[in-house]
């Protein structure tokens, strides 16, 4: 998992409440067991005017020019600004995969659905909670400033805007450690690889019959 220490990026404002995981990545794209290939279909039903299907050439599909992600000014955005209850709906981990693969490093919102919130941390995507007044201020700045960027400093737990305004945010200490060091569940387990090896060797000595070949 890619570490998250400090990130400066273009902000894309998604001014909708209760964005659910089926809107983030529609159900027809969930057949793959791989963690890649979902970015091109992020917000598929909003980005395109036709019904998307797996394996389509998206470059030939009609674009919804009224959807914010298709605005030229937000191309290359890596910070998604959202509203309350982002990521509600089903528990699909693909939603975090799609956002990450598209290029978003963080989603800033007043609140998140619990399962999406947890899935994001496990996949290197920072779900960052600011209060409604602070989020409203960021939306206002996005509207009046083309090319609006901000910096998220995870170590300092601060959002730093273009004019130098800072917003502090809270994050669980363990989750912060994992993001700073790029540790997913596998990475955390591998930190204890030597202890696991020692345990398995001792286990084989204590209970050798468990490892005897079957006849």
Curated annotation (Swiss-Prot):
Keywords: Amino-acid biosynthesis, Branched-chain amino acid biosynthesis, Leucine biosynthesis, Lyase
Coiled coil ranges: none
InterPro entries cross-referenced by the UniProt entry: 3-IsopropMal_deHydase_ssu (IPR004431), Aconitase/3IPM_dehydase_swvl (IPR015928), AconitaseA/IPMdHydase_ssu_swvl (IPR000573), IPMI_Swivel (IPR033940), LeuD (IPR050075)
SUPFAM superfamilies xref list: LeuD/IlvD-like (SSF52016)
Catalytic activity: (2R,3S)-3-isopropylmalate = (2S)-2-isopropylmalate
UniProt pathway: Amino-acid biosynthesis; L-leucine biosynthesis; L-leucine from 3-methyl-2-oxobutanoate: step 2/4
Cross-referenced Gene3D superfamilies: Aconitase, domain 4
GO biological process: L-leucine biosynthetic process
Protein function: Catalyzes the isomerization between 2-isopropylmalate and 3-isopropylmalate, via the formation of 2-isopropylmaleate.
This protein's name: 3-isopropylmalate dehydratase small subunit
Record organism: Xylella fastidiosa (strain 9a5c)
Species classification: Bacteria, Pseudomonadati, Pseudomonadota, Gammaproteobacteria, Lysobacterales
